[in-house]
């Protein structure tokens, strides 16, 4: 039905007859000549109909927005005065000779031109219309090209694209599973995979030493701008490669991807340990475009008569951190109060501050409600450590180390945006040397997942002292977003059992949930390592979209619903009976 895409017609086609199909983006009658902007996935082209062909002209006069049509005509150059530099096809137009209305369109329930006026609910309910917008179409086409480039790289490096099951068994990976009831085994359930983690490890045990898959994963978790209940991973696993080799290979892939798709050279990725990232930036995925850093000052404040500072300063699990904001002395009291409320979201009880109005006047040139508790030597050392100057403000977080990191790390990002401090467009890095475990309510939990290998310890040493052990794990971070995370895996049954016990999984539970893995580890398991990238998040960053919903064809809402299909929906009683399931209504609570 077509000879060319609309957006591909150019000056080289002048004098040629073309056949185009697409949608009427806009139609206008100017002095007896009808101009159509015809749109398809590749772009727009202007089609002109004049009264010399009255039959065709009359049909063209009836066209409305979003009619689906076929156009046959002659490509001609536009006069210089009519060249449209804003259009890819702006140097030419098509003189229409034939016109077929393939399908008419009713008035749209949402605007494609002023899409900002459409609610998120509308856009998702009529997603098939929203995707006609050039911006949305370009993102999905960009995504397809990225996916193709990733496949080419991995294929050329000896990786095998192998599918793993979607119906599988629940595993403890940090979020709730989506469960699928079994009709054959009533009362039993499959789980949709949160990742192909165990299957890709089993593939390494099978001898397929380089695996990849671009795969759907499912997590029933609370949603944010960068989360969806179903999402896509670039999943990679290798045998006989160290963490350094995996990082080098995947960095090569990412650098090549940015160069090919955006003509951006990311350069070599710097390395930073988890502890350094948390100390300097309050985050394990720091945005290095932001020059602000947290500075420890607890050692200066142990003896001050101000419990807000001295309490955490003398607590092994406490921290006092200072954050210097250049030019921040201009902040009003209300703005400081707003910052105080902001850190309160992260559990901080308050926010001390120090305005450096004029350092030539010594303490007289400093404004702060806590200044009376600090002597001049302490103040001068804080100023020296933070590198603060006249006109700056220093903000203080004092609490347990976790609260300080989370609250001041978030404030660092907010202040960087508020004061327009971000430098450069792309700042990648690797974060390495993650803790093996974290303690929550007195119990150990895996920082990555239970199959991550510790670094440099025996199973006996790990069980004897699990705290502060370092894992052989690594995250690739770009502009404050985790692009992907991975690790060396445990390939020894004794070590895997030890990790399970540390996590509170008894040997009996481990056998029930992971018996297949523990048995597989007995049969010559090779050392193996891998990494998984969030494809949706990569596309979001590369296209500048504000949400991963804008780079997915049919995403869910933030409440994990689909307005287009009205999913999730109720199952009919016969289906439930076949599955042996009865629905229990939630009891009504008394007011």
Curated annotation (Swiss-Prot):
The keyword Cytoplasm applies. Residues 197-200 are annotated as: Aspartate. It comes from the Bacteria. GO terms for cellular component: cytoplasm. It catalyses: tRNA(Asp) + L-aspartate + ATP = L-aspartyl-tRNA(Asp) + AMP + diphosphate. PROSITE patterns: AA_TRNA_LIGASE_II (PS50862). GO terms for molecular function: aspartate-tRNA ligase activity; ATP binding; nucleic acid binding. Keywords: Aminoacyl-tRNA synthetase, ATP-binding, Cytoplasm, Ligase, Nucleotide-binding, Protein biosynthesis. L-aspartate binds at residues 173, 219, 448, 489. SUPFAM superfamilies: Class II aaRS and biotin synthetases, GAD domain-like, Nucleic acid-binding proteins. InterPro entries: Aa-tRNA-synt_II (IPR004364), aa-tRNA-synth_II (IPR006195), aa-tRNA-synth_II/BPL/LPL (IPR045864), Asp-tRNA-ligase_1 (IPR004524), Asp-tRNA-ligase_1_N (IPR047089), Asp/Asn-tRNA-synth_IIb (IPR002312), AspRS_core (IPR047090), GAD-like_sf (IPR004115). ATP binds at residues 219-221, 228, 482, 534-537. One of its GO terms (biological process) is aspartyl-tRNA aminoacylation. It is found in: Cytoplasm. Its EC number is 6.1.1.12. Belongs to the class-II aminoacyl-tRNA synthetase family. Type 1 subfamily. Homodimer. Catalyzes the attachment of L-aspartate to tRNA(Asp) in a two-step reaction: L-aspartate is first activated by ATP to form Asp-AMP and then transferred to the acceptor end of tRNA(Asp). This is Aspartate--tRNA ligase.
């Amino acid at each position: 039905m077509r000879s060319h895409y609309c957006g591909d017609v150019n000056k080289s086609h002048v004098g040629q007859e073309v056949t185009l199909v697409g949608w009427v983006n806009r139609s206008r009658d100017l002095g007896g000549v009808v101009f159509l902007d015809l749109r398809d996935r590749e772009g727009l082209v202007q089609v002109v109909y004049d009264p010399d062909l009255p039959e065709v002209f009359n049909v063209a006069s009836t066209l409305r927005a979003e009619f689906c049509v076929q156009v046959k005509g002659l490509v001609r150059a536009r006069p210089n005065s009519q060249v449209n530099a804003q259009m890819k096809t702006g140097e030419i137009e098509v003189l229409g000779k034939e016109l077929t209305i393939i399908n008419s369109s009713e008035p749209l329930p949402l605007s494609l031109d002023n899409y900002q006026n459409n609610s998120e609910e509308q856009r998702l309910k009529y997603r098939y219309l929203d995707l006609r917008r050039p911006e949305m179409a370009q993102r999905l086409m960009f995504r397809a090209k990225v996916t193709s480039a990733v496949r080419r790289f991995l294929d050329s490096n000896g990786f095998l694209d192998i599918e793993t099951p979607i119906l599988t068994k629940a595993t403890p990976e940090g979020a709730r599973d989506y469960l699928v009831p079994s009709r054959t085994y009533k009362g039993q359930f499959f789980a949709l995979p949160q990742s192909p983690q165990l299957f890709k490890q089993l593939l390494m045990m099978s001898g397929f030493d380089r695996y990849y898959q671009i795969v759907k994963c499912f997590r029933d978790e609370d949603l944010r701008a960068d989360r969806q209940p179903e999402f896509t991973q670039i999943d990679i696993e290798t045998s006989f490669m160290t963490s350094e080799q995996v990082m080098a290979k995947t960095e090569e892939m990412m650098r090549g991807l940015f160069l090919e798709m955006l003509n951006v050279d990311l350069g070599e990725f710097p390395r930073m340990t988890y502890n350094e990232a948390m100390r300097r930036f309050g985050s394990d995925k720091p945005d290095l475009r932001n020059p602000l850093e947290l500075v420890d000052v607890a050692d200066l404040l142990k003896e001050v008569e101000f419990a807000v500072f001295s309490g955490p300063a003398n607590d092994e699990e406490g921290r006092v951190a200072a954050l210097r904001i250049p030019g921040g002395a201009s902040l009003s009291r209300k703005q400081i109060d707003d910052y105080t409320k902001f850190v309160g979201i992260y559990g901080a009880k308050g926010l001390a501050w120090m305005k450096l109005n004029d350092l030539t006047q010594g303490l007289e040139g400093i404004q702060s409600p806590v200044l009376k508790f600090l002597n001049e030597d302490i103040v001068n050392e804080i100023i020296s450590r933070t590198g603060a100057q006249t006109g700056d403000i220093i903000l203080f977080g004092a609490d347990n180390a976790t609260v300080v990191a989370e609250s001041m790390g978030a404030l660092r990002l907010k202040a960087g945006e508020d004061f327009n401090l971000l430098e450069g467009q792309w700042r990648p890095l690797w974060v390495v040397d993650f803790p093996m475990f974290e303690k929550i309510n007195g119990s150990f939990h895996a920082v990555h997942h239970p199959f991550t290998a510790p670094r440099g310890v025996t199973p006996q040493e790990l069980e004897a002292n699990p705290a502060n052990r370092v894992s052989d794990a690594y995250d690739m971070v770009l502009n404050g977003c985790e692009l992907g995370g991975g690790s060396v895996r445990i390939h020894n049954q004794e070590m895997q059992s030890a990790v399970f016990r540390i996590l509170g999984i008894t040997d009996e539970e481990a056998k029930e949930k992971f018996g297949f893995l523990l048995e597989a580890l007995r049969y010559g398991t090779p050392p193996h390592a891998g990494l998984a990238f969030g494809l949706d998040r990569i596309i979001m960053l590369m296209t500048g979209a504000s949400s991963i919903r804008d780079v997915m064809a049919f995403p869910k809402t933030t409440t994990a619903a689909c307005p287009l299909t009205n999913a999730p929906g109720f199952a009919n009683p016969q289906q439930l009976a076949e599955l042996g399931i009865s629905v229990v209504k939630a009891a009504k609570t008394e007011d």
